Amino acid sequence: MSTIDYIYRFDPKNSSLKSSPPDAEAARKSLENGNRMFAKWMENCRTSDISTEGACYVVECSGVEVGMNRAQGQLPKQAPFAVVVGCSDARVPTELLFGQGFNDLFIIRVAGNVLGDVCLGSIEFAMNALSESVKCIVVLGHLGCGAVTGAVDSYLQPLKFWSKSNPPMLRTITQRIFVAVREAANGLKESWGPDAHSVPGYRQALIDIAVCVNAAQAAFELRLEVERAAKWEIEVLYGVFSLLNHQVSMPVNPRAPVHPDNVNLAYAPTNPREFSTIASSMADLLKPASHEPASSRENATANTTIPSPK
């Protein structure tokens, strides 16, 4: 029976350490290319196209990275090339979706990818203790985020924030996301009009936009942390993983087809004013067909101004 395989491969005849990206740009390309491979694999599995049966997608791994061939008691050196700050959601397999293997990524996962003290402390550890290898920091949001959805629902129905189903520690996460939700709501009002909240699809659009703005705000904060630490060689990027097409991108279009050009990581904002631009751009992209002419829909993605690497 033919299968469509996603394989972690080690070649014992070539057991040397694999090369790591030499700089931030190479690190970004490695992550994006890995996601293109993963998204293609997922699409092939979904469609079960007979022409793709037997296809094999390979992530090269070195056993040396996890201690093979070392004397007993010796530990392998930790040398990730990227720090990824993502959500705890089990549907977002970080190494897999970026096509990376052992010792490639230093991953910090917390609901809503919010930057609390413990999270920031972990990032500072990576920037200092692992400075020889770390080339970039990535904030990874995802569509369908439960933490952002909870924040949006509390924003729309404030009494939910104080309900027994929303315990105190969970409220601290919700509070950190409220700023992104308010920015998203302002973007929708600007794009969809003052009665945006009454337009069908408003809640889902508010969630999707808040996910993007939340990731952008975290990336902005981390850019400041990197600058304060004078780690000029480290680039801060961000993107959103779609559970629909399995692509990481920014801006993110839930309706976008699986295509190499639809994968990209954006540079962290350099100014808080960029948050409103992101929210408005996403609102334009998600505007219902009944609220815009066809020509505007066709150009929605092209007109976004979110800074992405070229």
Functional labels for PLM-detected ranges:
Residues 39, 83-86, 96-97:
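Non-catalytic terminal/interface segments that mediate subunit docking, oligomerization
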Residues 79-81:
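Glycine/small-residue-rich phosphate/adenosyl-binding loop
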Residues 85, 109, 239:
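Residues in well-ordered beta-strands of folded domains
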Residues 86-91, 111-114, 142-145:
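Short glycine-enriched loops at secondary-structure junctions
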Residues 91-109:
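Catalytic core of membrane glycerolipid acyltransferases/transacylases, capturing the structured
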Residues 135-139:
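Well-ordered alpha/beta subsegment
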